[in-house]
Amino acid sequence: MPTASGSRVWGSRTWLGSPSGRPSHDDPVLGRIGGPDVGVIVLGSANHDTSVSMPRIPGPGETILATGAASGPGGKGLNQAVAAARSGASTTFVGAVGDDEAGERLRGVLIEEGVRAGLGVSERPTGTAFVMVADDGENAIVVVAGANGDGAAITAEAASALASAGSGDLVLAQLEVPLDAVLSAFRSAKERGATTVLNAAPSRPLSDDQLALVDVLIVNQHECLDLAGAPVEGVAGAAVADAARLLAARVGTVVVTLGSEGALVLSAGEATRIPAFPVTAVDTTAAGDTFCGALVSRLAAGDPLAAAVPFASAAAALCVQRSGAAASAPRLDEIMELLESRAWSA
């Protein structure tokens, strides 16, 4: 698949960097990122998820019979941290849990995944999410924030984690935790020369001053339109592209995930469309989170954005073929196998 400059990023492992696997490089937009000591710090939510499988999502006032239920770790932040670690990044997760059994289980999950856990303990209970998953892979989610809403606990843990951050490190956050905690972490990251990545989900208004703290913005189609102030009664391709250009003028680098249509990347005044991998979705719950975690893992490894986005798309394609949230994130060898098995171009 050609990049905006015409060079290919598919076909061999060479696009993943030098033989050491962790080179550094000067990205024309993001500056110097990647290297042997580069780490990923993910700030965000951690939930105990209860997922229910069903033929379709019920309408208001409707009762339907489920076909199964399961519980496991989730939350956008935790999902992204696990995805980054499984993709090969040295990863730290910053968040908050309650002083309860669910919080201890989430701490154990992070340890098992090799993720350093900066978990503040809140007086509030651990966050909980209830996920409805239809047979076609679509989902509807209700979240009880709990400890994820404890901005003071999260900010304290972030300050500790960021104390050793430096140039080349990446800090990834979402908006399932208090905005003040995210902005505080990004200010500290920028002061230390780290690269900031914001997955603006769930969507909320952000000022120009707030977006100035963001180096890379990741949104889906609806979030793109909403954040740009465009009408959201539909996701026509032209409207999304126009909204993405408006955001790129405020941020610089914007990645819009388009579901089965791939991703749109706007950077350095150029737009690049990256196709998706055609797969049959089983559960799309953690697709976006897996994309974000995999993307920052490759930026940390030294890949340019033009290579990191296809890698993230491959990771998301594997993710949606499995059930669950954090548990559905693929590992590096699986992603590489998919990339090497698909000799296609755009």
For the regions a protein language model found, what residue spans apply to each?
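Conserved phosphate-binding/catalytic loop of the ribokinase/pfkB sugar-kinase fold
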Residues: 96, 121, 131-170, 175
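Short gly/ser/thr-rich secondary-structure transition/capping motifs
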Residues: 114, 149-156, 196-203, 275-276
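Conserved beta-alpha-beta core of the PfkB/ribokinase-like small-molecule kinase fold
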Residues: 168-242, 261-263
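Structural alpha-helical scaffold elements that stabilize or flank donor/cofactor-binding regions
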Residues: 161-165, 210, 247
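A glycine-rich helix N-cap at a beta->alpha junction
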Residues: 109-123
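Glycine-rich phosphate/adenosyl-contacting loop at the front of the ribokinase-like
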Residues: 10-96, 101-111, 129, 281, ...
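Conserved phosphate-binding/catalytic region of the ribokinase-like
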Residues: 10, 15-16, 20-21, 25-38, ...
